[in-house]
UniProtKB/Swiss-Prot annotation:
Species lineage: Eukaryota, Metazoa, Chordata, Craniata, Vertebrata
Name this polypeptide is given: Parathyroid hormone
Organism this protein belongs to: Equus caballus (Horse)
Family the entry assigns: Belongs to the parathyroid hormone family.
Signal peptide bounds: 1-25
Gene Ontology biological process: adenylate cyclase-activating G protein-coupled receptor signaling pathway; bone mineralization; cell-cell signaling; homeostasis of number of cells within a tissue; intracellular calcium ion homeostasis; magnesium ion homeostasis; negative regulation of apoptotic process in bone marrow cell; negative regulation of gene expression
Propeptide feature: residues: 26-31
Matches recorded under PROSITE patterns: PARATHYROID
Keywords from the UniProt entry: Cleavage on pair of basic residues, Hormone, Secreted, Signal
GO cellular component: extracellular space
Keyword Coiled coil included in the entry's annotation: no
């Protein structure tokens, strides 16, 4: 059997463990930012700095290009709209014949002709 002194010591130790462990799985104190979070933030910052530097270089190129008075040309004319109605006509090789037309195209054409 245990003596009363040993029983008191055991009870004090158990009480201390109970008080320290009663945190429901959460840390008793707020933890500081971990090294992983710091590295993540550093990576995002370096990526942001790299993007800003790239954009600054591109804007500097555009500024220099305009400052020289060079005309601006569009690639493939894809972003330009036709200036005249005649420029909007399809090339014969790209036009569909009536046999190749989709059923939806024929329906739309028949509805517009009837009006």
């Amino acid at each position: 059997m245990m003596s009363a002194k040993n029983m008191v010591k055991v009870m004090i130790v158990m009480f201390a463990i109970f008080l320290l462990a009663k945190s429901d799985g959460k840390p008793v104190r707020k933890r500081s930012v971990s090294e992983i979070q710091l590295m993540h933030n550093l990576g995002k910052h370096l990526n942001s700095v790299e993007r800003v530097e790239w954009l600054r270089k591109k804007l500097q190129d555009v500024h220099n290009f305009i400052a020289l008075g060079a005309p601006i040309f569009h690639r493939d004319g894809g972003s330009q709209r036709p200036r005249k109605k005649e420029d909007n006509v399809l090339i014969e090789s790209h036009q569909k014949s009536l046999g190749e037309a989709d059923k939806a195209d024929v329906d739309v054409l028949s509805k517009t002709k009837s009006q």
